[in-house]
Regions:
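A structural signal for short, well-ordered beta-strand segments and their strand-loop junctions
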Residues: 77-80, 150-153, 281-283, 310-311
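N-terminal amphipathic/basic-hydrophobic helices that include classical n-h-c signal peptides
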Residues: 1-18, 326
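Aromatic- and acidic-residue-enriched segments that line the glycan-binding/catalytic groove
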Residues: 86-111, 157-233
Length: 326
C-alpha cells in the first residue's frame, strides 16, 4: 500500500480529531435513502424490467411511523436521493413530459444524476403525477414533524443529454436557450459544444428505438470529455455544464462578467431552498470551480442562513488536503 505523506500531517490529524470529537449535540447523522427503492415491496423484480413490472417506491411511503423509526436510530437528517426529475425510459407524455431516447438513459428508471428538469420532481415517486411537487412538499412537512431535517441532491456539473424543463419558473430561462453552438467555448454559453460534429457515441445509439439518438452539434460529455465520441464507460447520458472555464485552452477562467450558468444555478438553489429543505448534498462539487461556490453559497445563506451545503468527496486526496486548511 502506498502511504501518502502530507507537509502538515500533524495539523491535519488534529483537525480530524476535532471533527470526530465535536460536541454530540452538534453532530450531523445522515440517513441516506434511495427514494425510489424505499417502500417498493415487489419481490418479483425482473432484469431490465420497467416500472409496471418491477414497481417503484413513492414519497408517500415515508409515513410518520417510518420516519419516526429512522429518527430513533439517532438520525438528524435524511438524504432523499433522486428527488429531482431525471432522464427515464418511463413514458410520461400524457403529463406533458417529453420522452427520453433509450440510448441516453442508463437502465429503465434512469440515473438520478442525469437531471432532466432542475425545477421538477421525479414523476416515478408520486402517487399522483400531476401533484408530484405537492407530494414532495408534504414529504418535507412530514419529515420535519418527526424532528428530522431534509437533504436533497444538487447536481451542478452535468445534466441529461435531453435536458428540458417543463416547469421552468417565470422570470428564468432554460439552460442552453441563448447558447451559440457554433463556439466550442463561450463564457456566455451554458454548454460546451463540438461545432459541426454530430454525436458519434461508441455504442448502440438506437437501443431498441426505431431511430438512433441524434445530437448536432454534439455537446461535451459530463465527465469532461470534449469530443463527439463518448464510449460506454463515460458519463455518456450527461452533458457538461459551462461555468466559464475553458478546459481545452489551459483551463483559463472567464468569471467576469458573472457567467450565465452561475446565475441559473443560483436560481435553482434558491428555488429548492424555498421548499423548506435543510440542505444540499452537492454532487461532484470538485468539478465545479470553487469561485462559483464562494459566490453562490453566501447568497443562498443570506436568505436561508441555516441551510447546509455538503460536498461529495469523489477524490479523497483533495478532501485530505482541504483538512490542512480548516
Amino acid at each position: 500500500m502506498e502511504v501518502t505523506s502530507y507537509p502538515s500531517e500533524k495539523r491535519m490529524n488534529t483537525n480530524i480529531n476535532n471533527l470526530l470529537y465535536m460536541n454530540d449535540e452538534n453532530k450531523i447523522i445522515i440517513y441516506q435513502v434511495f427514494t425510489r427503492l424505499f417502500g417498493n415491496n415487489n419481490n418479483h423484480c425482473v432484469y431490465n424490467g420497467d416500472i409496471a413490472t418491477n414497481g417503484c417506491g413513492k414519497m408517500a411511503d415515508f409515513t410518520l411511523k417510518a420516519l419516526g423509526e429512522i429518527k430513533k436510530l439517532g438520525t438528524t437528517h435524511i438524504w432523499y436521493t433522486g428527488i429531482i426529475e431525471h432522464a427515464t425510459q418511463t413514458d410520461y407524455r400524457r403529463y406533458n413530459i417529453s420522452p427520453d431516447h433509450p440510448a441516453v438513459v442508463k437502465g429503465k428508471a434512469g440515473s438520478p444524476y442525469a437531471i432532466k428538469d432542475y425545477y421538477d420532481v421525479d414523476p416515478d415517486l408520486a402517487n399522483d403525477v400531476q401533484e408530484r411537487m405537492k407530494e414532495f412538499e408534504n414529504l418535507v412537512h412530514r419529515t420535519h414533524r418527526t424532528g428530522l431535517k431534509v437533504i436533497i441532491d444538487f447536481v451542478p456539473n452535468h445534466v441529461a443529454r435531453q435536458y428540458h424543463s417543463d416547469a421552468q419558473p417565470d422570470g428564468t430561462t432554460e439552460l442552453g436557450a441563448n447558447d451559440d453552438p457554433s463556439q466550442s467555448f463561450s463564457p456566455y454559453n451554458n454548454f460546451y459544444y463540438i461545432p459541426q460534429a454530430e454525436l458519434r457515441a461508441q455504442f448502440d445509439m438506437k437501443d431498441g428505438a426505431a431511430e438512433p439518438y441524434r445530437e448536432f452539434p454534439a455537446k461535451a460529455t459530463g465527465n469532461n470529455r470534449f469530443d463527439a465520441t463518448p464510449n460506454i464507460t463515460d458519463w455518456y447520458e450527461t452533458v457538461k455544464l459551462n461555468y466559464g472555464v475553458d478546459y481545452q485552452n489551459g483551463g483559463t477562467c472567464h468569471f467576469s462578467p458573472t457567467p450565465d450558468t452561475w446565475i441559473k444555478m443560483l436560481d435553482i438553489l434558491l428555488f429548492w431552498a424555498s421548499k423548506n429543505i435543510d440542505g444540499f448534498r452537492c454532487d461532484m462539487a470538485e468539478m465545479v470551480p470553487v469561485e462559483f461556490w464562494e459566490w453562490a453559497i453566501p447568497q443562498v445563506k443570506e436568505v436561508y442562513p441555516e441551510i447546509l451545503f455538503i460536498a461529495e468527496v469523489y477524490n479523497p486526496s483533495e478532501y485530505r488536503l482541504s483538512l490542512i486548511h480548516i
